[in-house]
């Protein structure tokens, strides 16, 4: 028996009806894209700080404490970079983190895909708790993902 969080895709519909929040989010704008994820533009202190913050939530009884992490492709160029990512994932699990997922795509690539969808039919992104072909998403969801990727690690 556990406690569930918000729906993994409620950030769009929910955000449209939720007022402004103390973290600076404006009324009517998209909510955070995961129950343990920082709000858009708030993940400014690096991945370690983000994981430590998310791990402060007691996830032992929660079935849906999703943490979305946005990474720029340049942050995973070498074998050493991949080892560091593996260490981050292990550290998050050791702190009690249950569900972490990644978007590894550059903002410029997403904007290019919006202009020339025929060139990017194979571009897959994490939306929330699911993956989708970017060019198959509606414009509002695409724009939200573009905004999320403006601040990536």
Give names to the regions the model predicted.
Residues 1-153:
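Acidic, glycine-enriched catalytic cores built around paired aspartates
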